[in-house]
């Protein structure tokens, strides 16, 4: 069964296949199911880009979308996530997309349910589709991963984006560097080296900025937030020292003038909104992978 839970479960070949499908979709290919197929979006945390790009992807593939609201469901009566997914499975849903505040919520589910789970983000753990859309954006820009230098900058400890990207990009041959306030370093990470931001600015090909996650921080970190932009953000002055041909990325939502100067969000180097566009194509590709009998085999029509 084609769950997509973490980047560690994907081989280089599987990553390449997903990116190839995503590139095909980006270049105008269409794949639509010819039979009614239900998928459910279960978002237990707020989301704009991930939720709506999944929904756009699902509808472009001809899937019937069930949007789940925890506040209006039996979760409020104590129903477990397992029972919720089994209920959806029982009534004919063929895949579920889940975002949940619990790290690795899927460990207790993956061997117990009979439909694919696509992880749309688990706590501070993993965000595989964000990673895949980032990989697609980098590949479109440079045509390769091998030998690239990538700086992942900011709130590394709380970031599922940092974890997924560092692991996948290392596997694909890139060199990863981190720059972070001391309080937000992830000392357990084995996928990169910490260096001062100002040393990295002129060296790296990709400056990947991370959102300061206010909702995951303790109160004692408030003072750091006030001076974050000047000490740890991409200021206009730092952008001027960036390597020729290098790009700016951010998973969004962007805290303007915190992680990045507002005037840089849509500057020539920025690929922030391109990442969002690529999110639809990547999520179409992972849905195709999860539902091969519906979207990858005899029961689909391919329009070029």
UniProtKB/Swiss-Prot annotation:
Keywords of this entry? Pyrimidine biosynthesis, Transferase
Q: Which GO terms describe its cellular component?
A: cytosol
Give the first-level EC class, as a single word: transferase
Pfam families (UniProt xref): OTCace, OTCace_N
Q: In which pathway does it act?
A: Pyrimidine metabolism; UMP biosynthesis via de novo pathway; (S)-dihydroorotate from bicarbonate: step 2/3
Q: What is its EC number?
A: 2.1.3.2
* GO biological process, alphabetically ordered: 'de novo' pyrimidine nucleobase biosynthetic process; 'de novo' UMP biosynthetic process; amino acid metabolic process
Under the GO molecular function aspect, what terms does this record hold?
amino acid binding; aspartate carbamoyltransferase activity
Q: Which reaction does it catalyse?
A: carbamoyl phosphate + L-aspartate = N-carbamoyl-L-aspartate + phosphate + H(+)
The residues that the entry says bind L-aspartate are 77, 160, 211
List residues binding carbamoyl phosphate: 49-50, 99, 127, 130, 252-253
Q: Which SUPFAM superfamilies match?
A: Aspartate/ornithine carbamoyltransferase
Keyword Ribosomal protein on entry: no
Whether Transcription counts among this entry's keywords is no
The record's subunit annotation is: Heterododecamer (2C3:3R2) of six catalytic PyrB chains organized as two trimers (C3), and six regulatory PyrI chains organized as three dimers (R2).
Q: What does this protein do?
A: Catalyzes the condensation of carbamoyl phosphate and aspartate to form carbamoyl aspartate and inorganic phosphate, the committed step in the de novo pyrimidine nucleotide biosynthesis pathway.
Q: Which family does it belong to?
A: Belongs to the aspartate/ornithine carbamoyltransferase superfamily. ATCase family.
Q: What is this protein called?
A: Aspartate carbamoyltransferase catalytic subunit
């Amino acid at each position: 069964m084609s769950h997509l839970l973490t980047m560690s479960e994907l081989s280089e070949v599987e990553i390449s296949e997903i990116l190839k499908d995503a590139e095909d979709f980006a270049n105008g290919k269409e794949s639509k199911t010819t039979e009614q197929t239900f998928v459910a979006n279960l978002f237990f945390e707020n989301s704009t880009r991930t939720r709506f790009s999944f929904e756009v992807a699902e509808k472009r593939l001809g899937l019937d979308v069930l949007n789940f609201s925890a506040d209006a469901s039996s979760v409020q009566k104590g129903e477990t996530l397992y029972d919720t997914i089994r209920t959806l499975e029982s009534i004919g849903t063929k895949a579920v997309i889940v975002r949940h505040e619990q790290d690795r919520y899927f460990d207790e589910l993956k061997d117990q349910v009979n439909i694919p789970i696509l992880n749309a983000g688990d706590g501070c753990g993993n965000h595989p589709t964000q990673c895949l859309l980032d990989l697609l954006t980098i590949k479109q820009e440079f045509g390769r991963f091998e030998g690239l230098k990538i700086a992942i900058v900011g709130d590394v400890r709380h970031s599922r984006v940092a974890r997924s990207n560092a692991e996948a990009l290392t596997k694909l041959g890139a060199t990863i560097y981190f720059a972070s306030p001391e309080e937000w370093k992830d000392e357990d990470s084995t996928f990169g080296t910490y260096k001062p931001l100002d040393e990295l600015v002129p060296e790296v090909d990709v400056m990947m900025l991370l959102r300061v996650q206010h909702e995951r921080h303790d109160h004692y970190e408030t003072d750091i937030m006030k001076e974050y932009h000047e000490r740890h953000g991409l200021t206009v002055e730092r952008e001027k020292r960036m390597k020729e041909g290098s790009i700016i990325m951010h998973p969004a939502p962007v805290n303007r003038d915190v992680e990045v100067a507002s005037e840089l969000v849509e500057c020539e180097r920025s690929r922030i909104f391109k990442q969002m566009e690529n999110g639809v194509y990547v999520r179409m590709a992972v849905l195709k992978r999860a539902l091969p009998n519906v979207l990858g085999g005899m029961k689909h029509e391919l329009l070029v």
